[in-house]
């Protein structure tokens, strides 16, 4: 791991809230960044699905490969006391008896991730990242890694770069300790993820700066709206140049380096699946209900001033479909700004149809075309958190998918949002979009994982509590 000088961008002057001001006072940071040294951590790229780097824990350092995860806040590695989990047999394990700087804690801990979990206990020791030595850092020794999630993983553990608000056990995150000990001059870190898995350089994480070699133009910054995750407000999602009609009034989004794909609401992912020909899960119940109630819903949409009440009036709230977020349904009559539907969770599949139908009505489609369109969308309903396959030979005919962030449109081409596994006749193509529905008040929510961050160099600006995106280079 080499260290080289990286520049700090001069950020435009912005009004800083109390949290920003407190951060600057605490770390002695001025409003604008200045040139300084940043610590560069080289990352390895495994099939565009996992990006990991090396750290050392203890004295002398015991080496571990970790995912640097902006979607969580704890550091954990397998423990030498992990006796009964098969996953521990295939990964490096921390031995406290081999470290002269180890301090016992012993407090139990457990973390649940989207696709797996770990449990163990807290310990304290030094953590080495490149040339930076973080002293007296609390971390978790994992003694249980159930299931197969971590068994085949190319990494040993996870180093969280989220906020302390979501830290299990309220442990101080490594990034916070790094700042408190004055190891970096500026409270900012940045990611470049190389999407060419064949190249030797898989990517890089820079603590305390940004690398100008890996982005073009200026970063577009958006404020963090909820500390915990690196969460911000995102605007409309476009398929081609057409709105999906769901996030036009705003959706929450999280920049998450620990998630491989783009995860979003079933409502939009279904529309994307239909547009790119992804093979989703057929829902016969969805199709039969649309055939039965579709025409009546269209008639009510054309006349009803409060479309959010249509589903309950039609007694469709008993339909128990896949989990979804609260819907934002916009009136077709006055095209007023979207309001929260207020529908209970079981009503959401019906509300999803309302959104789809409204989009078609706006495009002056006929009743027959609207019914056929929604019927086809039923066939494309994805499995929650499931992957969808696409035809590798059809990429040239697929549309761009775009996200609106900070008033700017960030495009993804089919070559960028489709993951190709293998070569030649045996190649398989996986859609980079997966369904993940979050209940209010936290939803509707998108997770912009490596598929997005690989195309857009990402700056996590803790001092000003904002996230920045620029075209990667």
Swiss-Prot record:
Its EC number is 3.4.23.-. It holds the Pfam family Asp. GO terms for molecular function: aspartic-type endopeptidase activity. Mostly present in the violet parts of styles and corollas of mature flowers. CDD domains: phytepsin. Belongs to the peptidase A1 family. Disulfide bonds join 82-88, 247-251, 286-378, 311-350, 317-347, 392-429. Signal peptide: none annotated. This is Cyprosin. Residues 281-384 form the Saposin B-type domain. Glycans are attached at residue 364.
